[in-house]
């Protein structure tokens, strides 16, 4: 391959992002390492944060949104009794209001009661430093200009919250949550609930996302050091993004119809009921992944996003 040329590769790279890199910087570096023609990620991680960042190449980018609503697991370190303008170590730090002493002393009973109160469906006010849009602009643009925007509380789901360690002002937590959860805000809210006036994140690591976890991930440094001929073996197939959906196998005639944009009569996968609006993974008889389909009210399977093949079926 000549220098500077791009490859039309497809697949999913599970990246272990380093701290200090924005998600886009990590994406562009991975794209360069693989000489990929097209790439995209499945949702951002803050620059300070480390951990799992799935990156899609080629045809896999069509399904990158599949993980936006997936559950996530984080490991975080909180500094209790202090606040940050950004909710993390990158902002301006100050002693939390009402904290005459910088010393925090909590009982196990207090910690356990607060921990339990945060599990389930709770409300959370999104932070100013977020990508949520206000009048067409990300909220963080207003925050950087010193403008405070009123935000409405949102319902989020905390599936599990464990206190891994606690000593002095430092608390380590592990949280599994639904989409839309801001761990920076969770840290602040935990600090308030514990009677510490607040808290901020000193470290954040995403360890799992939508069925993927860190042991499967690669670092940019490791990929750079790897022989180019071995890098493609690090990629997962595009359909790994959709493995929570039921598979439907179709014959060659139906596969051709789907690829031509036509709906086909629904076929029930084993043990599955195809209700209207249900999305499915589509395969041909050779178990080749065709793409994503959706069940219509008439029971037909309509093509939603399909893989482009260089050769005909």
Curated annotation (Swiss-Prot):
Q: Please name the top-level EC class of this enzyme.
A: isomerase
The protein, known as? tRNA pseudouridine synthase B
| Family as reported in the entry's similarity comment | Belongs to the pseudouridine synthase TruB family. Type 1 subfamily.
- Which SUPFAM superfamilies does the annotation name? Pseudouridine synthase, PUA domain-like
| Molecular-function annotations in GO | RNA binding; tRNA pseudouridine(55) synthase activity
- UniProt lineage: Bacteria, Pseudomonadati, Pseudomonadota, Betaproteobacteria, Nitrosomonadales
Active site residues of this protein: 46
Q: One GO biological process from the UniProt record?
A: tRNA pseudouridine synthesis
Q: What InterPro entries does the record point to?
A: PsdUridine_synth_cat_dom_sf, PsdUridine_synth_N, PUA-like_sf, PUA_sf, tRNA_psdUridine_synth_TruB, tRNA_sdUridine_synth_fam1_C, TruB_C
